[in-house]
Regions:
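Activation targets extended, charge/polar-rich intrinsically disordered C-terminal tails
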Residues: 2-12, 112-197
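Non-catalytic ligand/cofactor/substrate-binding and regulatory segments of enzyme domains
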Residues: 2-47, 53-124, 135
Length: 197
């Protein structure tokens, strides 16, 4: 079944009124094959960094049509081409009447603001870009989202795109640590003995 993402103008059959926000959100379908995640935040691993620390990754935020926007580097916001590859996790956002109609405008504001900013891994990054959009939209009545809030949301609320990417994400972490153990087994064991005794 092919999904249509023109939900802002979609109407019920025989009804001239635009569908309610809740109806529009229900009709939004995640289409991982075509990399479309309407009204979602998305996450992808950072090469090497996420293999060692799997809780660290790169985020983006999606329009009503599912197009990904991500702050990919200094003065650069990628659109429909996520900087570090296709998402492996996503969070469907729970929007309401107060912010769904202008959602794309909030994403555009975030792009405009972050397209003029220097990227910094520690304090002005892709997570900050997502937080900015949520603050503009007053997501869940809040305007105080930070990069830490976005990180935490991905830790507790994200869903994997599929089993295979879930397996690969975890396998990379286990594989890297297994290689470290093979190379420096005695040192690795000593570190854990010191830490946990």
């Amino acid at each position: 079944m092919e999904a249509s993402y023109d939900i802002m103008s979609r109407t019920e059959p025989g009804n001239d009124q635009i569908a309610s926000p809740k109806e529009r959100l229900k009709r939004c379908e995640i289409d991982a094959d075509n990399v479309r995640y309407p009204y979602c935040m998305v996450w992808t691993p950072l090469p090497l960094i996420s293999w060692i620390l799997p809780m660290i990754g790169h985020t983006g935020i999606c329009t009503s049509e599912g197009v990904i926007h991500d702050f990919g580097g200094p003065y650069y916001v990628a659109v429909d081409d996520m900087t570090f590859g296709n998402p492996t996790k996503y969070i469907p956002l729970q929007l309401d009447e107060t912010n769904i109609d202008d959602w794309d405008r909030y994403v555009e504001r975030g792009d405009k603001a972050y397209g003029q900013m220097m990227h910094n891994l520690c304090c002005n990054n892709c997570h900050s870009h997502c937080a900015y959009v949520l603050n503009q939209a007053k997501y869940k009545g809040n305007t105080g989202y930070t990069m830490i809030h976005i990180w935490w949301m991905f830790m507790i609320r994200s869903k994997y795109v599929g089993f295979s990417v879930s397996f690969i994400d975890h396998y990379q972490f286990i594989g890297i640590h297994q290689i470290i153990y093979w190379i420096h087994g005695h040192t690795y064991d000593s570190c854990f003995t010191i830490l946990f005794n």
